[in-house]
């Protein structure tokens, strides 16, 4: 079953909050399989204060974090309807093959696509891509453990 999530549902499902909540909306999620999420990048983001003053660029590590949060939503949404899913933890274990293809700047909308490529027990591996429009901004494989 495909589902979408608004910001209120996302906030119930993720332990993150401002300024570290890096997913604004989920366009489509097949729980436990794949997700397409959005992060609207605005000039008001706190990291733009020092990264960089005259040339604001979203830090790559935060693009990776938005992919990790989207991936977490993919697996915790598998328990949609179970309000306890918000209490479920997913821990970042490793990242492989991280590549940054273009800068992300204020005004961009990141479209994050994450798919489960392997799940065994409580460990899950995701293939993640972040796009600005049709242009690939970043990609990585993320390994996480569900707690």
Curated annotation (Swiss-Prot):
- Which reaction(s) does its UniProt entry say it catalyses? a (3R)-hydroxyacyl-[ACP] = a (2E)-enoyl-[ACP] + H2O
One example GO MF annotation:
(3R)-hydroxyacyl-[acyl-carrier-protein] dehydratase activity
Show the InterPro entries listed in the entry.
FabA_FabZ, FabZ, HotDog_dom_sf
Any one cellular component term from GO for this entry? Answer: cytoplasm
Q: Which CDD domains match?
A: FabZ
The cellular location(s) given in this protein's UniProt record come to: Cytoplasm
User: Which GO terms of type biological process are on file?
Assistant: fatty acid biosynthetic process; lipid A biosynthetic process
- Full protein name: 3-hydroxyacyl-[acyl-carrier-protein] dehydratase FabZ
